[in-house]
């Protein structure tokens, strides 16, 4: 058998094994039975775009090639939606697919299940099992229906902000805290250039980052505002470009591929504002031998930080880690905006970048979760320290360049790292 035929046979066998893995059954006996209808919109656009996306022409699409297709302004409409669908199944938590051939795309088109739903959807039972076809349809609907205006109502609104398909909560938590504090300050972050590019003024205006307009694929993956403009998506792209530029010697990456790797929400406060931060760790509530006197003193310290941060209208964030307590309706390895603190009730007001609504199945608290409305929920101070890993508070003093040059600390994707 010639090498070309052996390569084709290996591709078909790999496709059959992928199909069996996703369908839960044994490998099928014939290649023909793995073929989905080639006239379906997803298959049509994915297969038409395949050769152009396959940069090294080896007959296989890897994640970097898909990311480059999503970042390309030449990949539009249905083909952009198809690339986004492949990117989503590649990012599966339980069964990620690291590469695609034409045969495997046909095999996976209707059987691959995408498990990238936020934790709150899984907790509420509202998680939707998506296929490549439904991911394609969702992406195409967003591409065709979203206005590309920077701000539609003159200024940003917190209501309607929803994290997209990226692990970008670390960048969204400080941004949405700023929207809550001063919407016009967010407007001042953006400057439209004559050539159509957009400059995002990070570091309190000292660090301008100029980016190209969103591609169709980028629009489909990034966060949304509920019809309030694409400012939040442009910010995510700018953060990704800023981070990629700060990694000398690293393998080149697209802005969205960089931003989805996660980072520190606290460090992002410095990146956004140019100010230093103060961190507060909740580690004493995860240590079995921690004494109550230490915990009581630390609660007093946290209340003082929350009280002054609220009074001075400074940005505040909090975050969970992979090892913090799981609370129904909320995610681990996730960053949150802290919107304020009420000393009279001892309640902290927090916003999840996902912007969800969640109703606890029982009494509100650590066991059943908290009532969440458009991402906003309130938690007593003695309870919030039991599931957050830490907090970060904006300070009035400027940050040193080394402190806000790169927000990518050693954290899990989407984690806040605020300890």
Label each residue range with its predicted role.
Residues 24-34:
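Signal peptide processing junction and immediate N-terminal pro/mature segment
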Residues 5, 28-29, 382, 409:
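Intrinsically disordered, low-complexity segments enriched in proline/serine/threonine
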């Amino acid at each position: 058998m010639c090498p070309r035929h052996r390569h084709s046979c290996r591709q078909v066998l790999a496709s059959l094994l992928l199909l069996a893995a996703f369908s839960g059954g044994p490998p099928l006996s014939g290649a023909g039975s793995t073929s989905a209808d080639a006239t379906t919109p997803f298959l049509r656009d994915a297969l038409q775009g395949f050769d152009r996306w396959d940069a090294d022409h080896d007959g296989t699409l890897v994640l970097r090639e898909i990311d480059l297709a999503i970042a390309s302004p030449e990949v539009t409409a249905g083909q952009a939606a198809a690339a986004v669908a492949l990117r989503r199944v590649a990012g599966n938590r339980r069964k990620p697919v690291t590469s695609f051939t034409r045969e495997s795309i046909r095999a996976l088109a209707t059987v691959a299940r995408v498990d990238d739903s936020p934790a709150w959807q899984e907790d509420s039972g509202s998680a939707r099992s998506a296929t490549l076809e439904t991911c394609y349809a969702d992406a195409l609907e967003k591409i065709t229906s979203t206005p590309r205006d920077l701000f539609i109502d003159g200024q940003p609104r917190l209501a309607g902000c929803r994290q997209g398909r990226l692990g970008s909560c670390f960048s969204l938590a400080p941004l949405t805290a700023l929207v809550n504090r001063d919407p016009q300050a967010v407007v001042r972050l953006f400057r439209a250039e004559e050539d159509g590019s957009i400059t995002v003024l990070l570091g309190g205006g000292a660090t301008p980052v100029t980016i190209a307009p969103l591609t169709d694929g980028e629009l489909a993956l990034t966060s949304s505002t509920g019809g309030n403009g694409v400012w939040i998506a442009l910010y995510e792209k700018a953060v990704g470009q800023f981070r990629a530029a700060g990694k000398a010697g690293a393998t080149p990456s697209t802005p969205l591929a960089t931003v989805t790797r996660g980072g520190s929400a606290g460090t992002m406060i410095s990146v956004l504002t140019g100010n230093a931060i103060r961190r507060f760790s909740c580690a004493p509530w995860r240590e079995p031998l921690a004494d109550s006197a230490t915990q009581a003193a630390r609660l007093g310290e946290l209340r003082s930080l929350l009280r002054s941060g609220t009074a001075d209208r400074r940005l505040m964030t909090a975050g969970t880690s992979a090892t913090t307590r799981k609370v129904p309706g909320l995610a681990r390895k996730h960053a949150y905006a802290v919107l304020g603190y009420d000393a009279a009730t001892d309640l902290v007001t927090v916003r999840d970048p996902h912007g969800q609504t969640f109703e606890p199945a029982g009494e509100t608290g650590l066991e059943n979760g908290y009532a969440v409305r458009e991402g906003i929920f309130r938690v007593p101070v003695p309870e919030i320290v039991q599931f957050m890993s830490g907090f970060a508070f904006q300070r009035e003093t400027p940050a040193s360049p080394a402190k806000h040059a790169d927000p990518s600390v050693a954290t899990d994707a989407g984690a806040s790292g605020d300890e």
